[in-house]
């Protein structure tokens, strides 16, 4: 595999084209905004295609599905290369010698999620709880792209009311987990509008129910969670989704109460939740026809930028390390490689470390704005701003 990865990098100059990784879910309807043919969303017993994972080395932890579901593939002039295997076989070639010496892999997952109903109120385990089942925590951040249908419920529920966090919050939430028969648990959370071009940073341990806006997400490298909401989109979700990443021992001994260990009560009940976690684009580069902004920030675990170029505009960027990018709108070139938004297979690249730290010219060759999003893993951009509103 090492020689194949080296050949692919040599062939492309370190700018690797990625094929789309489509992921099905069987517990929610799709939003049908991923650009697929109508008949391609329904995968039978596997559910519906609701997500597209980007530059992914993460396996989708579904009840049923192929062994490589969620994994991205590098397109070459010969065979396709599994990105997870490629990084494992040639970490220094992909991530750079110094970074590979301190990081086992890319350590992040980018995705587009596209649901026809609000995602149920759920939580991701903090590091210590995830480790009990051999998994990673799952801090995550969202960006809501503009000019896309927002769906039926473009508002998200986050956290719990402060009085719950300040008291015995477990006793408030546990009855809903035990009964497992409705969605009334949502009354204990705040709802926030999903505003185009904005987003949120949601750390592991925070309860959340993302709304129906098409969302570009950047997160830790994991597919761990526990559902706290039984009724969603008109049906009762299997209670196995509550216990999905709970050890057999904790489930046997503690039952629903085991999940209370996951809840970060201080963060959930933060009276300044919005102020501390909203993500508003932070522009750091402006020139004629050029606008580049941080859209994922506030965490050392990942970061990301949105670049917008007017027709005919170009920019030369130098980054700090390996990253993948999604061309969201328009057409152009990245280091001489033709790209086109909205065309899976022509809209996704991974730029290896040694190429990324050299000048990369990005050119808009089309008649509309070229918009692309860059995704970085842990510790690559220590200068990214903190989350929340500027004070």
Regions found by a protein language model. Give the residues of each.
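Ligand-binding loop in jelly-roll beta-barrel domains
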Residues: 114-118, 126, 134-137, 147-150, ...
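Double-stranded beta-helix
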Residues: 157-184, 216-266, 366-391
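Functionally critical, mid-to-C-terminal surface segments that flank or help form catalytic/ligand
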Residues: 256-320
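Short acidic-glycine-tyrosine-enriched beta hairpin
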Residues: 189-201, 333-361
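His/acidic/aromatic-lined binding-pocket segments of jelly-roll/cupin-type domains
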Residues: 110-112, 119, 140-143, 191-192, ...
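Transition-metal
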Residues: 1-168, 232-271, 304
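Conserved short histidine dyad/triad with adjacent acidic residue
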Residues: 119-130, 146-150, 300-319, 333, ...
